[in-house]
A protein has these predicted regions:
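Short acidic, glycine/serine/threonine-rich helix-capping segments at coil-helix boundaries
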Residues: 35-42, 48-167
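Basic/polar, cationic surfaces and motifs that engage anionic cell-wall
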Residues: 1-42
């Protein structure tokens, strides 16, 4: 943008805003680069849990990328096989067979499929917890996700919502 310096408003004109306690020096010296912690953060926690729950070996880098997405799909496929006898290939690809095996998940659901949904919502920038309990916060995040993606806003994760989450 061609901006070389940033000045405090009160140094340019007489004013009391934004106040002496405003962290101007800290903000003005920021590089604007994201520096994720490799071992801390919600995505790192999700990555660690995926490795532990599903015997995977993905990098713990606190970055949501293809490796983490594929691992979440593998987790979903594993759970659909275990809980519903879906006989899916656990390949990390959200294809037609995985889509067809998806079930409706709604408020009150508990455990691993709910945890996977919550984890995917976190990875798509929703500020919720991945506790495996489909409560009001998860339902609200699902409704907002559905709204952003042009889906019916019913708070139920069905085939179409799974498809948008995992494609």
């Amino acid at each position: 943008y061609g901006i070389n310096t940033v000045q405090v408003h009160k140094n340019v004109t007489a004013t009391n805003c934004p106040g002496d306690n405003f962290p101007f020096d800290q903000i003005a010296n920021e590089t604007g680069e994201s520096k994720p912690s490799k071992e801390k953060g919600k995505i790192a926690t999700i990555q660690t849990s995926l490795n532990e729950k599903y015997g995977l070996n993905i990098s713990i880098d606190n970055i949501y990328g293809n490796e983490t997405k594929k691992a979440l799909v593998k987790g979903l496929q594993t759970e659909l096989n275990k809980q519903f006898g879906s006989k899916l290939a656990v390949d990390g690809i959200f294809g037609t067979n995985t889509y067809n095996a998806c079930i409706n998940v709604r408020r009150g659901a508990k455990k691993n499929i709910t945890w996977i949904i919550q984890s995917m919502l976190i990875c798509t920038l929703f500020n919720i917890n991945a506790d495996g309990i489909f409560g009001p916060a998860t339902e609200s995040a699902v409704r907002e996700f559905q709204k952003r993606n042009g889906l019916l806003q019913d708070g139920i994760v069905g085939k179409n919502t799974f498809n948008k989450l995992f494609k």
